Regions:
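Short alpha-helical
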Residues: 12, 32, 56-57, 81, ...
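Divalent metal-coordination and catalytic microenvironments
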Residues: 17, 27, 37, 53, ...
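Short, flexible loop segments at the rims of nucleotide/cofactor-binding pockets, characterized by
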Residues: 2-6, 26-29, 49-52, 135-141, ...
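Glycine-rich phosphate-binding loop signature in dinucleotide/nucleotide-binding domains
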Residues: 41-44, 129-134, 191
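Metallo-beta-lactamase
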Residues: 135-211
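Residue-level marker for buried hydrophobic side chains located in beta-strands
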Residues: 24-26, 50, 73, 158, ...
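Active-site HxH/HxHxD metal-binding segment of metal-dependent hydrolases
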Residues: 35-121
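Conserved beta-strand hairpin/beta-sheet module of binuclear metal-dependent hydrolase folds
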Residues: 1-44, 150-164
Length: 214
């Protein structure tokens, strides 16, 4: 049985999945939470860090944690370049909420600073993470970013920022390609999971996505 720990890091969620003494960390949050996450990881034999996409609020601690724990990192194919060059991020806000998120993110000079690291793995649709001790399947969920991915663990789906749950489940408030984001939302609904876990916001039963406005 897979154990799940939700690591709340301000407005960002990281997830620790564990089974039979092996753990995988999903996303790494921002600088101020690195010691909190490191302490949890040290107690849980984390073998891999998976990054759902290449935005700073999800990858700022990847280099630090990878070095401290001596473990590999993985990111979706297509997002690796965001690690090295924030200027290529062609993200657009959706509505007032999206504009507000973008404004406050850019107001923090540290937000776009990411310590460099070279991902050990580039993940794509259908990849399995069994070699790290957990039966997780990778799903490609482009839209928010080109290389956004999710992870399926039995009835649980971890969607990163492919969907958000700030006030209610919705498409991402920021995206590179809205049409792709809509396709990814439809794909998530079609996966048949029971619980959806977001990069931002509380988890919901999958049936709540039936009223998603696309």
């Amino acid at each position: 049985m897979v154990r799940l720990k939700i690591i709340k890091c301000g407005g960002v969620n990281c997830y620790l999945l564990s089974r039979n003494g092996n753990s995988i960390l999903i996303d790494t949050a921002t600088y101020k939470y690195r010691d909190k996450i490191l302490d949890i990881c040290k107690k849980n034999n984390v073998r891999l860090i998976v990054l759902t996409h290449g935005h700073p609020d999800h990858i700022q601690n990847a280099a630090f944690l990878s070095s401290e724990l001596d473990i590999p990192t993985a990111i979706g194919e297509g997002d690796e370049d965001l690690i090295f060059d924030r200027n290529i991020d062609n993200i657009k806000p959706d509505g007032l909420m999206g504009k507000a998120i973008m404004f406050f993110s850019n107001a923090d000079p540290k937000f776009n600073v990411v310590p460099l690291f070279m991902p050990s793995m580039l993940l794509k649709e259908g990849d399995s993470l069994k070699e790290f001790g957990l039966d997780l399947k990778v799903v490609s969920l482009p839209g928010h970013t080109k290389g956004s991915i999710g992870l399926v663990s039995g009835p649980s789906i971890f969607v990163g920022d492919a969907l958000m749950n700030i006030f209610a489940p919705s498409l991402p408030k920021l995206y590179e390609d809205r049409d792709e984001a809509v396709k990814s939302a439809i794909k998530i609904i079609g996966l048949g999971g029971k619980k959806i876990y977001f990069g931002h916001g509380n988890p919901v039963d999958a049936k709540e996505l039936e009223s998603l406005q696309l």
